[in-house]
């Protein structure tokens, strides 16, 4: 799978940043940063949130660069691959009750892309036990309007993954279309740091209450902000300063 993804990425180098990130990918320098998602009231860890990082200390997000659309898709698929490998490691090393289900942010468009369709099919066929502990956290806006394609995809994910989340941000125009696909959880990518941001959050808060969604507060930066999210009804949270992401690297990946 690793060699397949590297081969796919090399075909889609367009920008200088594409080349930079590809070189890191090829040399196994792209890692997952793992961050706890906690229960809002108890603080107990319920899930692990995984994003891609690279650099000497794994401090740089790969998505901070100017990447072509297809290279971003390749990285999304690579992120899913790393989640499968981490989950497989847990299955082999720990008792089933101790396994942490892992949340992977991924663009809907990456999974509707022809190579993404193939990758998902291979994942379900050959890595089903690991995929059962993965939670795709889907990112989309305009694509949500293509209800038939997205419905087919979400049905497949619900049947094979642990559960299905959707991400909602204040920048999204079509976030209410998420309701068409009955997500198990909503992950909010918003902040409450100033009056303008809190005002932008109101339509999303109304949307969540209307559909009685269980939701995760992301980007929580302080105890004060966490308390606000608790009052607003958040069931889970992540991003708090006490949970600095830890980079994970599996040097044996290139053997696959």
What are the functions of these language-model segments?
Residues 98-102, 129-134, 160-162, 184, ...:
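Short, well-ordered coil/turn segments that N-cap beta-strands
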Residues 1-29, 33-35, 41, 53-54, ...:
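EAL-family c-di-GMP phosphodiesterase catalytic domain
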Residues 112-125, 145-153, 173-185, 229:
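Distinct, well-ordered alpha-helical segments
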């Amino acid at each position: 799978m690793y060699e397949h993804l590297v081969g796919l990425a090399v075909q889609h180098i367009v920008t200088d940043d594409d080349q930079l990130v590809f070189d890191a990918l090829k040399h196994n320098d792209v890692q997952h940063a793992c961050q706890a998602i906690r229960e809002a009231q108890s603080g107990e860890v319920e899930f692990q949130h995984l994003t891609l990082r690279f650099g000497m200390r794994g401090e740089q997000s790969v998505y901070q660069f100017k990447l072509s659309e297809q290279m971003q898709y390749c990285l999304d698929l690579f992120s899913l691959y790393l989640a499968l490998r981490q989950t497989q490691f847990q299955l082999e090393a720990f008792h089933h009750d101790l396994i942490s289900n892992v949340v992977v942010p991924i663009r809907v468009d990456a999974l509707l892309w022809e190579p993404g369709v193939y990758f998902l099919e291979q994942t379900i066929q050959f890595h089903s036990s690991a995929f059962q502990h993965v939670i795709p956290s889907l990112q989309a806006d305009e694509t949500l309007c293509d209800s038939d394609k997205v419905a087919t995809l979400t049905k497949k994910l619900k049947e094979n993954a642990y559960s299905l989340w959707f991400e909602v941000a204040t920048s999204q125009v079509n976030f209410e279309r998420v309701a068409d696909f009955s997500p198990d959880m909503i992950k909010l990518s918003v902040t409450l740091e100033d009056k303008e941001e809190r005002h932008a959050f109101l339509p999303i808060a109304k949307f969540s209450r209307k559909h009685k969604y269980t939701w995760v507060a992301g980007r929580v930066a302080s105890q004060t902000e966490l308390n606000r999210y608790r009052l607003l009804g958040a069931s889970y949270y992540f991003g708090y300063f006490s949970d600095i992401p830890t980079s994970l690297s599996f040097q044996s990946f290139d053997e696959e």
